[in-house]
């Protein structure tokens, strides 16, 4: 009997800033997700400060500290295995795509920028 596995991806808001003293806002969406194993997952962040140049995605497993998953400078795409980070500076929008989701992907994902 084969059971369908689910991957729980929890998204949190994270605000990081090291660029002068201007007000900066970062917002993540969607909220908590449950997706079938093997699906493609899209996690998104929007930001308000066009001065941001460094874009990071962190993964944090339960009861562990966050670990750097992807790092991108300026704009464009960066791919690492099943993970792709995409930055669109003109829209102030970044995304993380996870292909072929696995149970081991169950974690909290955080976007950060500076």
From Swiss-Prot:
Gene Ontology BP terms: adaptive immune response
Recorded GO CC terms: T cell receptor complex
SUPFAM superfamilies: Immunoglobulin
Secretion signal span: 1-21
Keyword Oxidoreductase among UniProt keywords: no
MF-aspect GO terms: peptide antigen binding
Cell compartment(s), UniProt: Cell membrane
Keyword Cell membrane: yes
Domain of life: Eukaryota
Residue spans crossing the bilayer: none
Glycosylation site residues: 44
Alphabetic keyword roster: Adaptive immunity, Cell membrane, Disulfide bond, Glycoprotein, Immunity, Immunoglobulin domain, Membrane, Receptor, Signal, T cell receptor
CDD domains hit by this protein: IgV_TCR_alpha
Domain Ig-like: 24-114
Disulphide bond pairs: 45-111
Chief location bin: membrane
Subunit structure, as described in the record: Alpha-beta TR is a heterodimer composed of an alpha and beta chain; disulfide-linked. The alpha-beta TR is associated with the transmembrane signaling CD3 coreceptor proteins to form the TR-CD3 (TcR or TCR). The assembly of alpha-beta TR heterodimers with CD3 occurs in the endoplasmic reticulum where a single alpha-beta TR heterodimer associates with one CD3D-CD3E heterodimer, one CD3G-CD3E heterodimer and one CD247 homodimer forming a stable octameric structure. CD3D-CD3E and CD3G-CD3E heterodimers preferentially associate with TR alpha and TR beta chains, respectively.
Functional summary from the UniProt entry: V region of the variable domain of T cell receptor (TR) alpha chain that participates in the antigen recognition. Alpha-beta T cell receptors are antigen specific receptors which are essential to the immune response and are present on the cell surface of T lymphocytes. Recognize peptide-major histocompatibility (MH) (pMH) complexes that are displayed by antigen presenting cells (APC), a prerequisite for efficient T cell adaptive immunity against pathogens.
Protein name, UniProt field: T cell receptor alpha variable 12-3
Provenance organism: Homo sapiens (Human)
């Amino acid at each position: 009997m084969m059971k369908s596995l689910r991957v729980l991806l929890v998204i949190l808001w994270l605000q990081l800033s090291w660029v002068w003293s201007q007000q900066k806002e970062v917002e993540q969406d969607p909220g908590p997700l449950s997706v079938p194993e093997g699906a493609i997952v899209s996690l998104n962040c929007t930001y308000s400060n066009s001065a941001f140049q460094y874009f990071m995605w962190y993964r944090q497993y339960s009861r562990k500290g966050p670990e750097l998953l992807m790092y991108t400078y300026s704009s464009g795409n960066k791919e690492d295995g099943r993970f792709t980070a995409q930055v669109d500076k003109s829209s102030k929008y970044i995304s993380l795509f996870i292909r072929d989701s696995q149970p081991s992907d169950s974690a909290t994902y955080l976007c950060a920028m500076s």
